[in-house]
A protein has these predicted regions:
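Glycine-rich, flexible loop/turn motifs
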Residues: 18, 55, 152-154
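Alpha-helix initiation/capping motif
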Residues: 1, 9, 38-39, 75, ...
């Protein structure tokens, strides 16, 4: 986009930011000829420069598993609300069905549920821990690693959503995406989790 607008100051091209969520018939870019008309050769150069500048990716169907861990302080209504919120969030990505699981907030219990999801051919595993992830030796990261999983990143420089864990599990010829969900993902408001999910469901992450 910078290169397009560097061709001439007689035309301005603006668009939504990269990786924005878009819907059918939504305007994603606008073009303005500043003096209302420009030289044809300049226009051709702008068009040539704009090749492959904009791409729209469809959401892909994926088998999603939602695992929630609980401890003695976990309220049943919190678990129920998390399921409802997550289903609505995923519905915006074209996912109409998810597999739900609940277990104790212990490495052995959570590891077992993750392994079960792997065996059930999950494409994406979302884990809401009973407590926030403190470090790589916490319950959720340890449970991921016990299933031969790899931590890609712990923490994200965005608020809300900074206490997120991104990982992957290699199973046969398939890579399973894994997200240790931050507390903000229990809220329906758009946050950093949405930006990650959009990329995963479009095959970009």
């Amino acid at each position: 986009l910078f290169l397009i607008n560097s061709v001439t100051d007689e035309i301005g091209v603006a668009s939504l930011k990269s990786y924005s969520y878009v819907k059918k018939n939504q305007v994603i870019a606008s073009i303005k000829a500043i003096p209302f008309a420009i030289n044809k050769e300049i226009l051709k150069k702008v068009v040539k420069t704009s090749n492959n500048c904009f791409k729209v990716f469809p959401f892909l169907k994926k088998n999603v598993h939602l695992i929630q861990s609980r401890n003695q302080n976990t309220l049943e209504k919190v678990l129920e609300k998390t399921v409802i919120t997550t289903k609505k969030r995923l519905l915006n990505c074209g996912i109409t069905k998810i597999i739900e699981k609940v277990c104790d907030h212990e490495i052995k219990s959570l590891s077992s549920e993750i392994q079960e999801s792997i065996n059930e051919n999950a494409d994406l595993i979302l884990v809401f821990g009973a407590s926030a992830i403190c470090d790589k030796n916490d319950v959720v990261p340890k449970s991921l690693k016990k299933n031969n999983g790899k931590i890609l990143r712990l923490g994200m420089p965005v608020e809300p959503g900074n206490l997120i864990l991104l990982g992957e599990i290699k199973n046969a010829n398939k890579k399973i995406s894994f997200i240790g969900m931050p507390g903000c993902a229990r809220s329906p408001k758009e946050n950093g989790v949405d930006w990650i999910l959009w990329r995963i469901f479009c095959g970009l992450g």
